[in-house]
Amino acid sequence: MKTARRRSRELAVQAVYQSLINRTAAPEIAKNIREMSDFAKADEELFNKLFFGTQTNAAEYIRQIRPLLDRDEKDLNPIERAVLLTACHELSAMPETPYPVIINEAIEVTKTFGGTDGHKFVNGILDKLAAQIRPDEPKRR
């Protein structure tokens, strides 16, 4: 059974994905997501923080992610890009959530929506990103 927080992360990634693909305004995307049947089981506050925070800071987040990529950013699968941007926001703006939790949640969301091995790629990038964004947080190993 998915937690309300997992559903919020999934819905935030879907919203970021829609913004990347459709170039629709964030308020319209959020309205459409809120009308989905799954939204009733989500943490609305977390969804709002993740989606709108990612939208506001996406350019900065892609600058942080770009040097860690093994390919051109334009070659990123849109789902992987949405997951990386959303997780980057959570790592940057939500220090109350331990980074291993953020990475694990991003992996699970990628397994749900992404390609076959997309979760491995996301894991590798987020491990490096977490070390840069949260250098003082205790290591999980």
Curated annotation (Swiss-Prot):
UniProt record, GO biological process: DNA-templated transcription termination; transcription antitermination
GO molecular-function terms, A-Z: RNA binding
Keyword Glycoprotein among record annotations: no
Top-level taxon: Bacteria
Keyword entries, A-Z: RNA-binding, Transcription, Transcription antitermination, Transcription regulation
Gene Ontology CC: cytosol
Record's function text: Involved in transcription antitermination. Required for transcription of ribosomal RNA (rRNA) genes. Binds specifically to the boxA antiterminator sequence of the ribosomal RNA (rrn) operons.
NCBIfam families in alphabetical order: nusB
Database matches in HAMAP family: NusB
Sequence similarity: Belongs to the NusB family.
Protein name per the record: Transcription antitermination protein NusB
Organism the protein comes from: Neisseria meningitidis serogroup B (strain ATCC BAA-335 / MC58)
